[in-house]
Amino acid sequence: MPNWGGGNKCGACGRTVYHAEEVQCDGRSFHRCCFLCMVCRKNLDSTTVAIHDAEVYCKSCYGKKYGPKGYGYGQGAGTLNMDRGERLGIKPESSPSPHRPTTNPNTSKFAQKFGGAEKCSRCGDSVYAAEKVIGAGKPWHKNCFRCAKCGKSLESTTLTEKEGEIYCKGCYAKNFGPKGFGYGQGAGALVHAQ
């Protein structure tokens, strides 16, 4: 007997999933809005899902719950924290002295080799290779690589730097260039500064 208008059942909520809202994973169907990590409830897709015993997790929560435990394992220096996994049902090991993260600020070679990331000079968030621009010798997100005054998008050849901030050449000249008669933005904007 044909199934007129029906669909598969959602692996999370059990209701009917119609084709337009269906996400398939591990032979099961889910509503897009139900395809969430079992722990943190983040939305998942084919690049972020990890499956264990018919349960779906984001890769981060899966690694915390089922990944290798101990010193030296983890997700890279950019995501270290002191969470020991109690909320995931992991019982902490009793040890006389817990491991402490390093305080050595020189992590660039480690970060390049093991997947950590440098920090953006504007917003302070991690900058990964796909979004990294180098300007004034420092890393920036492509979206943060803008003039600090006017917000104009910059290129490494069109920027000027002062005290750790980057500016377009026009804003740099207006704000930090020479002042007085004969200096400025051209004959139409001459001023006399005292």
From Swiss-Prot:
GO terms for cellular component: nucleus; Z disc. InterPro entries: Znf_LIM (IPR001781). The keyword Transmembrane helix does not apply. GO terms for biological process: muscle tissue development; sarcomere organization. It comes from the Eukaryota. It is found in: Nucleus. GO terms for molecular function: actinin binding; structural constituent of muscle; zinc ion binding. A motif (Nuclear localization signal) lies at residues 64-69. The keyword Metal-binding applies. This is Cysteine and glycine-rich protein 2. It comes from Coturnix japonica (Japanese quail). The lineage of its organism: Eukaryota, Metazoa, Chordata, Craniata, Vertebrata.
